[in-house]
């Protein structure tokens, strides 16, 4: 492949990726929990209930908003629960739409933190000899450096998110209480099968929990902004069947969150290892969605009820 063709491919992919990235970020930036769409018969929320937002990545999307809201309705509690989980979410990404979340005026925000979000991003720099002897590698290296931030913002299928944005304008968030990820029933995969399939793919990653970490800085800014706007924040660690970090780093992560809990006076709950012996998993990263896997939803509801007293 000559350099002219390689450069053309590079420019084309970059432009398309940027367009998709902007369009998909737009959905997060304009989200309105009271919006029902241009073609919907429901133009507004009839009831003035206090809003509860659940934030996090796909590791929290299986928390069932319908079950939580059913509990609130049957117990005559004036709350409405929204699962705003988004693919590949992290504090660094979520802070970009933070002001829009605040403008929706939630009473409570529950934030599920994925330990993997705080891993060290490593990329070995090319030496001068490599650049001189293999200029194509340098070009590809720069391409990777440009593309990675774009990938971080693309939550899965660009086609799906583009359609989701169009549906948002016409019909409002679908489903209304679970707007950013498709919510559908998934089957349980036996733990033995999951571990068998992942035994050669597990790579232990180091965490960066220093004050210089962009994820840590973003998390602290999120905490500060919610406190400034009198929004109650509850943190919890999102569950995974297989954690790709060492036990020492896992312990350090817990200690760091406990430090923030004391420093900012916010509750923290640890669920990251809570379900590792339960047959409730779709894969190594996600709890399945069906009537036999509701323990995750039940625990989030229990946390809410404790913190709402």
What function would you assign to each model-found segment?
Residues 83-85, 237, 270-272:
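Residue-level recognition of beta-strand->loop/alpha-helix junctions
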């Amino acid at each position: 492949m000559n350099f002219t063709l390689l450069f053309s491919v590079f420019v084309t992919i970059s432009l398309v990726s940027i367009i998709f990235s902007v369009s998909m970020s737009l959905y997060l930036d304009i989200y309105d929990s009271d919006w029902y769409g241009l073609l919907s018969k429901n133009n507004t929320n009839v009831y003035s209930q206090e809003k509860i937002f659940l934030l996090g990545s796909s590791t929290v999307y299986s928390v069932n908003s319908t079950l939580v809201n059913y509990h609130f309705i049957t117990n005559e509690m004036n709350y409405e629960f929204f699962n705003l989980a988004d693919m590949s979410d992290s504090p660094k990404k979520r802070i970009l739409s933070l002001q829009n979340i605040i403008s929706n005026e939630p009473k409570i925000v529950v934030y599920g933190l994925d330990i993997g979000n705080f891993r060290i991003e490593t990329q070995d720099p090319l030496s001068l000899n490599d650049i001189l002897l293999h200029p194509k590698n340098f070009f590809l290296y720069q391409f990777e450096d440009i593309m990675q931030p774009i990938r971080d913002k693309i939550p899965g299928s660009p086609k799906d998110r583009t359609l989701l944005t169009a549906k948002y304008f016409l019909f409002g968030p679908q489903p209304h209480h679970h707007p950013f990820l498709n919510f559908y029933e998934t089957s349980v995969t036996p733990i033995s099968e999951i571990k068998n399939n992942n035994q050669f793919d597990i790579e232990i990653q180091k965490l960066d929990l220093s004050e210089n970490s962009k994820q840590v800085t973003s998390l602290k800014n999120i905490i500060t902004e919610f406190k400034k706007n009198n929004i109650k924040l509850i943190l919890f660690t999102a569950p995974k069947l297989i954690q790709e970090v060492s036990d020492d780093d896992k312990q350090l992560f817990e200690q760091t969150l406990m430090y923030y809990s004391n420093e900012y006076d916010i509750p923290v709950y640890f669920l990251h290892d809570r379900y590792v012996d339960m047959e409730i998993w779709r894969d190594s990263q996600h709890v399945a969605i069906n009537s036999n896997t509701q323990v995750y939803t039940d625990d989030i509801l229990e946390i809410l009820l404790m913190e709402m007293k």
